[in-house]
């Protein structure tokens, strides 16, 4: 039951993050509206933890394991990907054409 309450409080905190109001009453209202029975103690614990935490700031600092691209690289990435894909597609087509041609070097000719 406790993990269900923790998960409900976590989701409620994420929902309330934009309003900046993650107090006990707000957490209880959101969890009650979701149909989850959360104890006042659990909501109070989450509220006290989140009192001095900016959830949006925490979420913006989450790393997914990759290296972040440079700021200027974000706009050039789609164009670069398209440019890289074009020669690869042409090379694949050329290889396909070469495979179809009989060069006379077959093993069973």
From Swiss-Prot:
Segments for region (Disordered): 90-109
GO molecular function per UniProt: protein kinase activator activity; ribonucleoprotein complex binding; structural constituent of ribosome
Stored InterPro entries: P1/P2_N_sf, Ribosomal_P1/P2, Ribosomal_P1/P2_euk
Single GO biological process annotation from the record: translational elongation
Protein keywords: Phosphoprotein, Ribonucleoprotein, Ribosomal protein
Domain of life: Eukaryota
Entry annotated with the keyword Lipid metabolism: no
Gene Ontology terms: cellular component: cytosolic large ribosomal subunit
Similarity-based family: Belongs to the eukaryotic ribosomal protein P1/P2 family.
Assembly behavior: P1 and P2 exist as dimers at the large ribosomal subunit.
Function: Plays an important role in the elongation step of protein synthesis.
The protein's name in its UniProt record: Large ribosomal subunit protein P1
């Amino acid at each position: 039951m406790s993990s269900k309450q923790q998960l409900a409080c976590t989701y409620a905190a994420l929902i309330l993050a934009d309003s900046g109001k993650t107090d006990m009453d707000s957490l209880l209202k959101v969890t009650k509206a979701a149909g989850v029975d959360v104890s006042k103690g659990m909501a109070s614990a989450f509220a006290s933890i989140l009192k001095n935490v900016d959830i949006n700031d925490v979420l913006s600092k989450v790393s997914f394991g990759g290296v972040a691209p440079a700021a200027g690289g974000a706009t050039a990435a789609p164009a670069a990907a398209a440019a890289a894909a074009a020669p690869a597609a042409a090379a694949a087509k050329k290889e396909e054409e070469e495979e179809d041609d009989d060069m006379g070097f077959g093993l069973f000719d």
